[in-house]
């Protein structure tokens, strides 16, 4: 996975996906259905590898996908080892009208785990437009995907059904795995007031905010900010400090005590010579 090197590039993230499966399951049909893609493969002279790029929009981010596919022939196993290097996602493709292609998934998964272990995967049942010739029940494929812990789609390049959706879901899984969890969240720049509020409430319990020498409106905002942001969590964990006075040494000492509930404001008529502080 890579990010753009300059603002002129037309994408925010670059991902490499592999389409894996037996021959004649329609992997090339899936690639050909991508109208906006380009097909410039560095392995095109080998005649057994299809390559295409396309750009999808994921939560407002432009994600460019490099899609690689081999013909599924055994003589390309050595090539598979080479071009699987650096892959971020794998699309397991079978033909819903070809039972043998579905039963061969275990063989492909074993090969993937050998050359690209731990890479996120999705299972795709291709040629949904041939449902009248179906040999693989959807329920069986769904159960198989659940056993593998992967997402399952049935797609149709002829009807342009679920092609982009399946790519988008795999891209989402890959980006989340790489901890790019800012996708889908608005990039908000904190104001100076928010930064000041965060600093104050991080070291001041809620019940002591009212005692700060600040305008009433600002104190109210600070309490609301503290409740909303949860920055008072360390006071809620059942630990606090108590300032006690020693009668023998006539000096104050700070000792750690446990409380079983969140600290609250002491009553006005309290006669204790100690109070809770953070």
UniProtKB/Swiss-Prot annotation:
InterPro entries (UniProt xref): P-loop_NTPase, Small_GTP-bd, Small_GTPase, Small_GTPase_Rab, SOCS_box, SOCS_box-like_dom_sf
Domain of life of the native organism: Eukaryota
Lipidation (S-palmitoyl cysteine): 270
Domain called SOCS box: residue spans: 175-228
CC annotations in GO: cytoplasm; endosome; mitochondrion; plasma membrane; synaptic vesicle
Domain text: The SOCS box contains two defined motifs including the BC box that recruits and binds Elongin BC complex, and the Cul box which interacts with the Cullin family of proteins to form a ECS (Elongin-Cullin-SOCS-box protein) E3 ubiquitin ligase complex.
Stated name of the protein: Ras-related protein Rab-40A-like
Gene of this entry: RAB40AL
């Amino acid at each position: 996975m890579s990010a753009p090197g300059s603002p002129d590039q037309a994408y925010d993230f670059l991902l490499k996906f592999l389409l894996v499966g037996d021959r004649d399951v329609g992997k090339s049909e899936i690639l050909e259905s991508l109208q906006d893609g380009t097909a410039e493969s560095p392995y095109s002279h080998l005649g057994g590898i299809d390559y295409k790029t396309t750009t999808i929009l994921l939560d407002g981010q432009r994600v460019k996908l490099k899609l690689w596919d081999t013909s599924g022939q055994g003589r390309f196993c050595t090539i598979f080892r080479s071009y699987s290097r650096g892959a971020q996602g794998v699309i397991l493709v079978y033909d819903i009208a070809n039972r043998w292609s579905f039963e061969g998934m275990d063989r492909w998964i074993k090969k993937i785990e050998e050359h690209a272990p731990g890479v996120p995967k999705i299972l795709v049942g291709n040629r949904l437009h041939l449902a009248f010739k179906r040999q693989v029940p959807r329920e069986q494929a769904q159960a198989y995907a659940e056993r593998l812990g992967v997402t399952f789609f049935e797609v149709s390049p002829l009807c342009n059904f679920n092609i982009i959706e399946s790519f988008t879901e795999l891209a989402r899984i890959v980006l989340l795995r790489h901890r790019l969890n800012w996708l889908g969240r608005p990039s908000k720049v904190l104001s100076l007031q928010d930064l000041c509020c965060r600093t104050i409430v991080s070291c001041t319990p809620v019940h002591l905010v009212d005692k700060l020498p600040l305008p009433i409106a600002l104190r109210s905002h600070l309490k609301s900010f503290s409740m909303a942001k949860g920055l008072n969590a360390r006071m809620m964990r059942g630990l606090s400090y108590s300032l006690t006075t020693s009668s023998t040494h006539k000096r104050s000492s700070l000792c750690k005590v446990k409380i079983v509930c969140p600290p609250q404001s002491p009553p006005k008529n309290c006669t204790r010579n100690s109070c809770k502080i953070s």
